[in-house]
From Swiss-Prot:
One of its GO terms (molecular function) is small ribosomal subunit rRNA binding. This is Small ribosomal subunit protein bS18. GO terms for biological process: translation. InterPro entries: Ribosomal_bS18, Ribosomal_bS18_CS, Ribosomal_bS18_sf.
Length: 84
């Protein structure tokens, strides 16, 4: 008997993830600024890496701006490159 026979799935309903909107779009949205360390640190992982947009639900354009701001902030010494 093969394990893959029978369709798998177990008769469960398909899971549809709700599409999250970009936190930087719309009114009252925070402005991406390299000096705003508190905002930028929310988009940096515990290891110091920039969190991808598929996890944070940031749009592609704003993700590029965010990455540029994080890199600029690191260069100026406001954010660490590596968190130990």
């Amino acid at each position: 008997m093969a394990f893959g026979a029978g369709g798998g799935g177990g008769g469960r309903r398909p899971f549809f993830r709700r599409r999250k909107s970009c936190p930087f779009s719309g009114e009252n949205a925070p402005k991406i600024d390299y000096k705003d360390v508190k905002l930028l640190s929310r988009y940096v992982s515990e290891r110091g890496k920039i969190v991808p947009s598929r996890i944070t639900a940031v749009s592609a354009k704003k993700q590029r701006e965010l990455a540029q701001a994080i890199k600029r902030s690191r260069f100026l010494g406001l954010l660490p490159y590596v968190i130990k």
